[in-house]
């Protein structure tokens, strides 16, 4: 049987990474989240290149299963945080567009005479 240590180390590293990404998201460090998401994807690609033996003992399978479940659960939480952030940004964009529209409307009438303004 091939040595499973490299695979186990990669999965443990992936779990640590996604937990760090979650912590960054919870702290509003969105630029860092985006940067680390790239590292996360690269880690997944690295894992996919590791040869997995056909006959893995059931105790080791259980360990991998638990790691995978933790990774997937945390990733799901990160996706939810990202979705919430996207909704917040959508609201901010809409508010910005509304403000721009209001400013443009006021600018159209800026040359008009306002009540109480002395006329030439």
Swiss-Prot record:
InterPro entries: FliT (IPR008622)
Subcellular location: Cytoplasm, Cytosol
One Gene Ontology term, aspect cellular component: cytosol
Coiled coil: none
Keywords: Bacterial flagellum biogenesis, Chaperone, Cytoplasm, Repressor, Transcription, Transcription regulation
Subunit structure: Homodimer. Interacts with FliD and FlhC.
HAMAP family: FliT
Function: Dual-function protein that regulates the transcription of class 2 flagellar operons and that also acts as an export chaperone for the filament-capping protein FliD. As a transcriptional regulator, acts as an anti-FlhDC factor; it directly binds FlhC, thus inhibiting the binding of the FlhC/FlhD complex to class 2 promoters, resulting in decreased expression of class 2 flagellar operons. As a chaperone, effects FliD transition to the membrane by preventing its premature polymerization, and by directing it to the export apparatus.
The protein's name: Flagellar protein FliT
Species this protein is from: Dickeya chrysanthemi
């Amino acid at each position: 049987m091939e040595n499973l240590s490299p695979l186990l180390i990669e999965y443990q590293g992936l779990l640590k990474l996604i937990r760090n990404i979650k912590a960054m998201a919870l702290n509003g460090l969105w630029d860092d989240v985006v940067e680390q998401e790239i590292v996360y994807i690269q880690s997944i690609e690295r894992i996919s290149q590791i040869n997995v033996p056909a006959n893995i003992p059931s105790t080791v399978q259980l360990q991998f299963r638990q790691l995978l479940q933790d990774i997937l659960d945390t990733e799901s939480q990160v996706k939810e945080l990202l979705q919430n952030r996207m909704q917040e940004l959508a609201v901010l964009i809409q508010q910005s567009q509304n403000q721009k529209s209001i400013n443009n409307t006021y600018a159209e009438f800026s040359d008009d005479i306002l009540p109480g303004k002395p006329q030439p």
